[in-house]
Amino acid sequence: MANYFNTLNLRQQLAQLGKCRFMGRDEFADGASYLQGKKVVIVGCGAQGLNQGLNMRDSGLDISYALRKEAIAEKRASWRKATENGFKVGTYEELIPQADLVVNLTPDKQHSDVVRSVQPLMKDGAALGYSHGFNIVEVGEQIRKDITVVMVAPKCPGTEVREEYKRGFGVPTLIAVHPENDPKGEGMAIAKAWAAATGGHRAGVLESSFVAEVKSDLMGEQTILCGMLQAGSLLCFDKLVAEGTDPAYAEKLIQFGWETITEALKQGGITLMMDRLSNPAKLRAYALSEQLKEIMAPLFQKHMDDIISGEFSSGMMADWANDDKKLLTWREETGKTAFETAPQFEGKIGEQEYFDKGVLMIAMVKAGVELAFETMVDSGIIEESAYYESLHELPLIANTIARKRLYEMNVVISDTAEYGNYLFSYACVPLLKPFIAELQPGDLGSAIPEGAVDNAQLRDVNDAIRSHAIEQVGKKLRGYMTDMKRIAVAG
């Protein structure tokens, strides 16, 4: 099989990379009705599989789970989760032939085996759904021409998909129809109904493409979302300890610092995050972020280039074929780092202390978010897609580090994201070491003293922060989500 993206001509590639339209609430007036009365069979019962299924069932859809025979016979975790939640569970042979929509929510590396197993069992004219398009775009999986292929991709972990639904809301979602597989022209109707059934229509839906979703998703998770947080955690911890900071305090400042800092990012973008600093600290954070962007730009561009060309995917799939040797080695090495093995700090760190003593961390967040966004947009990805795959998801990933450090982040994210994270962080750490060595007092671990600032300089920095394209599109999208939530709560 050939990488699907690489079979397209340049015009087709650009058209699919640039496909992104914010859909109006009125386009979901019919809710999930298009799928009501039809049989939806989910393959896989992990975080996305279970939580999407719960939402879809609560939206009135007929949901069951198809699992491998051995998973059922051995009563594995997937079987237990599905049965404990009252779902019908059966083998592929028992459930797939009756399905109107088969939703493949297994890990990326299992997609080819799953699709090759279910395709012969699917009835003529059925639909196949994904929540990530890697199998279609990067693997180049060939799907029978009578089958409609759609995607509904919530921009949050599965647990958040469920919690937001229970609150009467949802999470921002991308939907797409594979242009090679829409024989009856019903793909968009299926995708819209599926998105509505998960609650995504209440938070905002982008009509996208499989290509745009995959390329932007890979870029975001490799760089700012996971790779930058891992590299930043390791570098900042080692710097603090080398300068005499108690390892336990240093660990807590970093572990919970990312979450605290990005909560401001979530509420008001880079502007609010930077506004949490004193004026002297803001100017310093801005200067550091500009230096970081200059240093890291070639690395971000290399990751984007390798994602666009398929070089990243081919390398990762080679590691799949080699029993994940690289992935497992990197995972083990990460677990042995000083940050991961540091003792816990029992004292309290106040919220503002994370900002005051984390100027470098804030600069890293700003630089990473802006670089990821800029690099995606320069590659033809529309700004809204780039926003969701950079700034929007960052607080969610930071929250995983707050739970159990980098271990938790790498457990929660997909193996695809974890592999890309290691590629980036292993390159980024040595790249930034000379920069880290030149830091000044107050950049990390201690506060920058209050003092006079130049008004014109502060004005120009504030203007530069607020006028960045990601702040403009972010303000629009966050405002839309707030409006949608207000409407949803009002009923």
UniProtKB/Swiss-Prot annotation:
Domain KARI C-terminal knotted: 209-344, 345-484
Cofactor: Mg(2+)
Record's catalysed reaction(s): (2R)-2,3-dihydroxy-3-methylbutanoate + NADP(+) = (2S)-2-acetolactate + NADPH + H(+); (2R,3R)-2,3-dihydroxy-3-methylpentanoate + NADP(+) = (S)-2-ethyl-2-hydroxy-3-oxobutanoate + NADPH + H(+)
Every KARI N-terminal Rossmann domain range: 15-208
Binding site for Mg(2+) 1: 217, 221
Enzyme class: oxidoreductase
Residues binding NADP(+): 45-48, 68, 76, 78, 108-110, 158
Keywords: Amino-acid biosynthesis, Branched-chain amino acid biosynthesis, Magnesium, Metal-binding, NADP, Oxidoreductase, Repeat
Cofactor note: Binds 2 magnesium ions per subunit.
GO terms of molecular function: ketol-acid reductoisomerase activity; magnesium ion binding
Positions annotated to bind Mg(2+) 2: 217, 389, 393
Database matches in HAMAP family: IlvC
NCBIfam families (UniProt xref): ilvC, PRK05225.1
Record protein name field: Ketol-acid reductoisomerase (NADP(+))
This protein's encoding gene: ilvC
